[in-house]
Amino acid sequence: MRLGLLILLLVPLEGGGAQASPAQARVSARANDRYDPTFRRYSKRYFGAGFDWFLFKAQAMAESELNPDARSWVGARGLMQLMPSTFQAIQTKRPEFASIDDPEWNIAAGIMHDRYLWRLWGREIGEGQRIPFMLGSYNAGEGTIGRAAAAARASQLDATLWPNIEHVAPSVPRWRYRETLGYVKKIDGNIARLRSNKPRG
């Protein structure tokens, strides 16, 4: 499956200072693979066998650095940094998702929420552009990205193209757009890192 814009935006994540050797980078990128089976399982369940599960691991890396105990200042929790209200809404459909603090259920709920956003944007956006809209909505809320799309249309731009959302982002009120645009790019960089360290064969 094409990942569209995301696989084209290869943004370096490392800042200045000493750089890790290629061997160290491989170890670092693969050090926390304990949740890989869970990412694989729920990626397949909610997006199908052909979908690249690295996307969701890369998202969790951006959200929590794969720390199941992560807490944000706004109250988001766990690997996928879910708000308790979002998790509770998902629990009404999946009561077996017992606890937001259980890594498996946190991942499962995060990917299930991604699927909701994927389908939401699928009504008007093709697969090649849909991933950044999904991720942007996960970060900022679908209403915010919807307002950005409306601003793009008002500017006579194609609102189904993520670069046009980036273009109008500064004009969208009540949106910390730099955080959202950086979030999408960071996930793309994480995917590149994961793929570069994927074993051959």
Question: Where on the chain are the PLM-derived regions?
Answer:
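Short, surface-exposed glycine/acidic/tryptophan-bearing loops
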Residues: A70-I90, R153-Q156
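Short amphipathic alpha-helical segments
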Residues: D36, W53-K57, M80
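Short, hydrophobic secondary-structure boundary micro-motifs
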Residues: P68-D69, R147
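Non-catalytic cell-wall polysaccharide-engagement segments
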Residues: G16-P37, Q88-M112, Y116-G201
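N-terminal export signals and maturation junctions of secreted/periplasmic proteins
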Residues: R2-F47, P68
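Surface-exposed patches in mature extracellular/periplasmic domains of secreted proteins
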Residues: Y46-F56, A70-R71, W121-L135
